């Protein structure tokens, strides 16, 4: 069940959903707007000749911080990691989805490549996979609305929520834009017959 504005407010009051800072004015009819933090990670193109999700490529991205009153310029075709200003915490009965803002999409800004789903039990800043698919550079301002989260009530609480010992939760408690940890417990099925 997708939560309405009144359900989001009730879930926050009951401790099922937490966003810090909590700003009730960000609540929309069936979502809550989230804002952009001032930290970004860019690919260090000179450190590696390729990307391998099975390897720890610790220097693949480099973190940058902009001043709160200065924009980050995302150039055409560029990809960067950002994060929400809000620290998000979901209990075992709530899952969420991050979606982009329509107004930014119309400027060519994508807020996530594939990872828009947020598991029940997650807590941390949401890492954004920012892309500029327009033909012009776009200014991204710290504190601006960058996306919206919608919330889903599970039919029953997750038995093993994100962050539990059995789920291999690589991003629990993440602060700021967090690089890929795909190499941790990398899985590749044997597909030979």
UniProtKB/Swiss-Prot annotation:
Could you state one GO biological process linked to this protein?
A: dUMP biosynthetic process
Where do the catalytic residues lie?
Answer: 129
Which range is the signal sequence, renumbered to this chain?
none
Enzyme Commission number(s) of this protein? 3.5.4.30
Query: Where along this sequence does the record place binding of dCTP?
Result: 101-106, 119, 127-129, 148, 162, 174
- Record bears the keyword Lyase: no
Pathway connected to this protein: Pyrimidine metabolism; dUMP biosynthesis; dUMP from dCTP: step 1/1
Keyword set, alphabetical order: Hydrolase, Nucleotide metabolism, Nucleotide-binding
According to its UniProt record, which reaction does this protein catalyse? dCTP + 2 H2O = dUMP + NH4(+) + diphosphate
| Pfam families the record matches | DCD (PF22769)
User: Which GO molecular function annotations are given, in alphabetical order?
Assistant: dCTP deaminase (dUMP-forming) activity; dCTP deaminase activity; nucleotide binding
| Protein role | Bifunctional enzyme that catalyzes both the deamination of dCTP to dUTP and the hydrolysis of dUTP to dUMP without releasing the toxic dUTP intermediate.
HAMAP family named among the record's database cross-references:
dCTP_deaminase (MF_00146)
Report the family membership: Belongs to the dCTP deaminase family.
Protein name listed in UniProt: dCTP deaminase, dUMP-forming
Specify the species. Bifidobacterium adolescentis (strain ATCC 15703 / DSM 20083 / NCTC 11814 / E194a)
Its taxonomic path starts at:
Bacteria, Bacillati, Actinomycetota, Actinomycetes, Bifidobacteriales
| Gene name per UniProt | dcd
């Amino acid at each position: 069940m997708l939560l309405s504005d009144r359900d989001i407010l009730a879930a926050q009051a009951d401790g099922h959903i937490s966003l810090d800072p909590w700003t009730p004015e960000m609540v929309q009819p069936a979502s809550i707007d989230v804002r952009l933090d001032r930290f970004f990670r860019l690919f260090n193109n000179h450190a590696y000749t390729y990307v391998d999700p099975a390897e720890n490529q610790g220097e693949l991205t480099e973190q940058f911080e902009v001043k709160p009153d200065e924009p980050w310029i995302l150039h055409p075709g560029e990809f960067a990691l950002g994060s929400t200003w809000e620290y998000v915490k979901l209990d075992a009965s709530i899952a969420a989805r991050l979606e982009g803002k329509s107004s930014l999409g119309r400027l060519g800004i994508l807020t996530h490549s594939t990872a828009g789903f947020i598991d029940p039990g997650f807590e941390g800043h949401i890492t954004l996979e920012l892309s500029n698919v327009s033909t012009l550079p776009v200014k991204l301002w710290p504190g601006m609305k960058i996306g919206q989260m919608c919330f889903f009530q599970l039919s029953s609480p997750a038995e093993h929520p994100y962050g539990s010992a059995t789920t291999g939760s690589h991003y629990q408690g993440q602060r700021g834009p967090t690089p890929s940890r795909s190499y941790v417990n990398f899985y590749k099925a044997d597909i030979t017959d």
